[in-house]
C-alpha cells in the first residue's frame, strides 16, 4: 500500500478536466500537476486515501512531444495557465474532447458533430481585465497571484496571458502604494487598507480604468497617487474606488466611488461602441469574443422580421450586435449598472429597437410571455451555473424557432440541452471557441432548433395569418394564447395549440421538408391545457 512520500514510477494515461495528469497505481487513481499523457515519471506521493491520491513529479523519465518546454512554472503553480504546459494545438484538441465527452456523458448526445475548437492566432497576452490581490510578502507590499488552492501570494510582474500594458499599470500602482506607505490587506488579522487592484483596458480604444478595492473609504494622499499614475499612463480615463470591509473572498463590496474621470471606459465589439462600468460583465478576450458572438449570430441565421430575446445580456454586447439585423431585441440582466450601460450603449450606437430590463432571466421571460412578446430567436449566455429549469421551460413555451446557447461551462450546458430536448428542441450544431488560451476553460456555442409538431411528419406552423388556411383564420396562435391566459391563467405553447388543432381535425399547412427522423420525442399537451385550448377553439368558433 502506497503512503505519503513514497516514490514510484508511473505512466500518465489521461488529463483531468482541469489539466492534471492521471496515473493508475495499485488500483488507485493519482492526480499529478504538470504531467501529460504518454509521459513516464517518478512520482512522489503527496496524499493518498482508499481510492484516489495526489502526487508530484520528481523526475521525468519520458516526456511528451506535446510538452511546452518554455512555460514558467509559476503560471502552473498559480493556476494562471493551468494548461500552459501543453502545446497550443493539443490544447485545442483537449477542449474539443471535453465538449464531446460532456455532451455524451451528461446529455447522451453522440450523433451531433462537434466542430474543432476555434483557436487564437497569438494565444497569449489577451486578457483585457486584471484582478490582482495586494498582500505583504516578507515584509514588503506585493502584487501577484495566489498559489493554487491557497491564499499565499506569489509575487508576479508578468502575468503571461494579460495585456502587457495592464501588467505595467499594476507594477506602477504597486510601486506607488509602496512609496505612499499604504498598507496591504492582511486576511488573518483583518487589517490593512488595499485589498485588490482591478485594471481594465479597451482592446481597440486603449482606454484604461483603475479600481482600488479598499477596506475603508479614506485613502491617504490618494489624489497624489492618482496624479502620479496618470502621468505614466495618460490613457487612464477612470479611477474608481470600491469599499469592501467584509471578511469574504468576494473581490468587490457594495459601495463605489469615482475618484477621477468617468465611471466607465469605452471600447468596441463587432463594430459597436460600448461603455463598460467597473462591475459590468465584459468578455476578457475581445478578439475571441467577437468570433464567439459572430458564431452565435451565424448559427441563428437572423432575418429582418426576427424578434430576439437576449438573456443574461450584460452590457448589451451581443444583443446590440444583432439589433440592426432584426425587428426587435429584448434583453434582461440582473446587474443594474449593466442594464444602464446597455441602454446608454443602445443610444451611443443609434439603436432604437433594443429594450432592456433589470430582472432575473426567468422572471423577465415570464413577463414577456404575459405581454404577448413572441420571440423567434433566443440568445442565452448564462453564468457557469447555467440556466434555471424555470427559464428553460418558459423559453421553450415561447415556441422560438432557434435558441443559440453560449456557454462557459459545457457540463451545465449539456444538462440544459437535455431538458430542452425533452421540451421539443433538437441540438443542431456545436462550436467550441477558445476564449481562454493556456487554461482549461472553453466557451461553446450550441444551436437548438424547434422540432416539428408531428412525431413522423414535419409540420411548419406559421404565425403570419397570410399562411393560415381558412379554418385557422378565425384566430391566430397569439390570440389563442392570450385567451387561455386571461381565462385560465395557463401558458400554452404554439406546439400544444397545434397538437390540439390537429386532434380536432383542423388543417395545418404541411411543410415539404419532411423530417428524416421517424421517432422524434415530442412533449405532449397536458389534459388541463388541452381543455383550455379546446375552450379557446370553441370561443373562436374553430370547432
Swiss-Prot record:
GO terms for biological process: rRNA base methylation. It comes from Streptococcus pneumoniae (strain ATCC BAA-255 / R6). NCBIfam families: rumA (TIGR00479). InterPro entries: MeTrfase_TrmA_AS, MeTrfase_TrmA_CS, NA-bd_OB-fold, SAM-dependent_MTases_sf, TRAM_dom, U5_MeTrfase_fam. This is Uncharacterized RNA methyltransferase spr0932. Pfam families: TRAM (PF01938), tRNA_U5-meth_tr (PF05958). S-adenosyl-L-methionine binds at residues 283, 312, 333, 381. Residues 1-59 form the TRAM domain. The keyword Transferase applies.
